[in-house]
């Protein structure tokens, strides 16, 4: 039996330990995938969910268990683009259990690091799928294509991968040039719009 202990957003743990679909959250997951297929990116989807006052995954977990590290009482319905992006990447929505995505560097250090794909184990069809295979694959293709060139005609090394730690918005490449040197940096997309 797969050993993942915590269900992802969209699922609950059943009495036998298997994941069962959470109808309320599964509806939101399907909506996120539909919005992505319609051409919306994580930032726009997050904004739409926030405007609809849909509780975030952290808020839902807090309401069920009374504890979570991802619950912000002042913003119970404020979705981040980072949360949406993670939902769009999760293979668990295909009905698969994914184990060993991260590992601890040392027993002395609490932080985890992402494992390479060859160390990740996927157990297929362990629970009911929320998203069908064709939809999931199409979303992955669309997400890869969204990494578009910047105004200098280059696709940044971190394009589509960096998100603001404060608000969850996408980070954009900014270039500063002087006669002597060129400096690239990344700034928050929300900050740029102010």
Predicted regions and their residues:
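Conserved catalytic breakage-reunion loop centered on the nucleophilic residue
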Residues: 1-194
């Amino acid at each position: 039996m797969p050993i993942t202990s915590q269900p992802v957003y969209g699922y609950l743990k059943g009495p036998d330990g298997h994941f069962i679909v959470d109808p309320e959250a599964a509806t939101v997951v399907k909506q996120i995938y539909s919005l992505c297929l319609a051409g919306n990116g994580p930032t726009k989807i997050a904004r739409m969910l926030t405007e609809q006052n849909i509780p975030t995954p952290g808020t839902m977990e807090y309401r069920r268990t009374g504890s979570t590290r991802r619950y912000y009482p002042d913003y119970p319905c404020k979705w981040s683009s980072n949360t949406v992006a993670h939902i769009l990447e999760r293979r668990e929505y295909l009905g698969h259990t994914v184990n060993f995505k991260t590992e601890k560097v040392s027993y002395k250090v609490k932080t985890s690091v992402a494992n390479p794909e060859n160390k990740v184990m996927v157990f297929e069809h362990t629970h009911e799928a929320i998203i069908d295979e064709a939809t999931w694959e199409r979303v992955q293709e669309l997400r890869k294509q969204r990494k578009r060139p910047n105004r200098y005609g280059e696709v940044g090394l971190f394009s589509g991968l960096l998100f603001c730690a404060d608000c969850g918005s996408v980070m954009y490449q900014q270039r500063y040039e002087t006669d002597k040197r060129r400096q690239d940096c990344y700034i928050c997309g929300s900050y740029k719009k102010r």
